[in-house]
């Protein structure tokens, strides 16, 4: 499944550069494969894949079997809508793991380098281990259709620091965005309760197919009238029983459980043992 995505990635771009049907200079055009392509701010063109269902955890794309971790370390992708706590989770994971493992991080922002600067300012990792990428207007493309903007910095950091683990934070996007398996070996999708308890049942690839769903800011539940038991029920149903964690990342609650999920997968993928 994941390798299928990858072939499409190259296939799409063969057509993109031709900009068929007189599409030169247009913001969007129809490729020879019938898909509508568009590009933003000079980023490589990409299409928006149609989504016909909320997705299924059991049918999610499996991690790649032929991954060479000496080329790029085990990569954790952290996605989710704007303001849910992605950068706070990046910081928490760095603090939890940095003393035992060699880490590096790449952040994606649409037009700024704010998230990367936040990690530097808060001492998540030494500054040289953090890269901030500006994705332009379509942040989902940088984690799915046009991942080269992230692969480059990740591979460079991995080799430079002999990394054990890489963290990649997506730009804030909608519920339909999710990481390509070509980029992320383990996918965390983070939502929060401030939008109400209906979010898990809305579904979308992030909620249903991420390896781990994190429901953050549970301390706000009472204030916004969100029922955590409803969120738990809907998360179990939407994710076919796939794992999720209630958390207050800013206060450290749930972080160790998240780390345990990540490191279990890291052990399984790399054959190494936790320190």
Swiss-Prot record:
Stretches the record annotates as Disordered: 1-31
A GO biological-process term: urea catabolic process
Biased composition, class Basic and acidic residues, residue ranges: 13-24
Biased composition (Basic residues): 1-12
GO molecular function, one term: nickel cation binding
GO cellular component, one term: urease activator complex
Keyword terms of this UniProt record: Chaperone, GTP-binding, Nickel insertion, Nucleotide-binding
Stretch forming the signal peptide: none
Disruption phenotype: No visible phenotype under normal growth conditions, but mutant plants cannot grow on medium with urea as the sole source of nitrogen.
Binding site for GTP: 80-87
Biological role stated in the UniProt entry: Required for the maturation and activation of urease via the functional incorporation of the urease nickel metallocenter.
Subunit structure: URED, UREF and UREG may form a complex that acts as a GTP-hydrolysis-dependent molecular chaperone, activating the urease apoprotein.
Similarity section: Belongs to the SIMIBI class G3E GTPase family. UreG subfamily.
Protein name: Urease accessory protein G
Organism: Arabidopsis thaliana
